[in-house]
Design a protein with these regions (language model features):
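Histidine- and aromatic-rich ligand-binding microenvironments
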Residues: 8-9, 40-41, 94-95, 117
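Short, intrinsically disordered, charge-balanced linker/junction segments flanking boundaries
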Residues: 66, 118-122
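Short, well-structured N-terminal submotif of metal-dependent ribonuclease cores
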Residues: 1-40, 52-63
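Helix-adjacent hinge/juxtasegments
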Residues: 58-60, 70-76
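A generic structural signal for short hydrophobic patches within well-formed alpha-helices
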Residues: 13-14, 45, 120-121
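Active-site neighborhoods of divalent-metal-dependent phosphate/nucleic-acid chemistry enzymes
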Residues: 73-119
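Structured helix-beta-strand junction loops
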Residues: 33-37, 70-71, 91
Length: 122
């Protein structure tokens, strides 16, 4: 059976690293699922890596770097991706970063998008 192409939002990775509470348990369950092939983007990297690098949190940095080393593909920023994100944001009222994540997931033909956002958010 083919693996699900799963785009992981930054909130899921942040929760998994913190490893406390129900959200963390759910995040770790998704990340530990061998039936998934993970996809991410430059934008998720930008959301997660700068602070642990700046403040010397090596454990957090290594956690994220290990994840990013194993995603396929890592969707890269491009003018076309930004245009697609703008259309997405205008169509459903997303914030800029959320729209970039959705556009990246669509560009990578993901089967699902896993986020820590509330289900009521567009």
């Amino acid at each position: 059976m083919p693996q699900l192409r799963t785009f992981i939002d930054s909130g899921v990775l942040l929760a998994a690293f913190k490893a406390a509470g129900e959200l963390a348990e759910n995040a770790l369950a998704v990340l530990g699922d061998a039936e998934r092939r993970f996809v991410s983007s430059d934008f998720v990297r930008l959301e997660l890596l700068p602070k642990p690098i700046c403040y010397g949190n090596d454990a957090e940095r290594l956690f994220y770097e290990t994840f990013f080393a194993n995603v396929e593909p890592l969707v890269q920023a491009s003018a076309l991706l930004v245009e697609a994100a703008e259309r997405e944001a205008e169509a459903v009222g997303l914030s800029a970063m959320d729209a970039l994540h959705i556009a990246a997931a669509k560009q990578a033909a993901c089967d699902e998008f896993v986020t820590a956002e509330k289900s009521t958010k567009p």
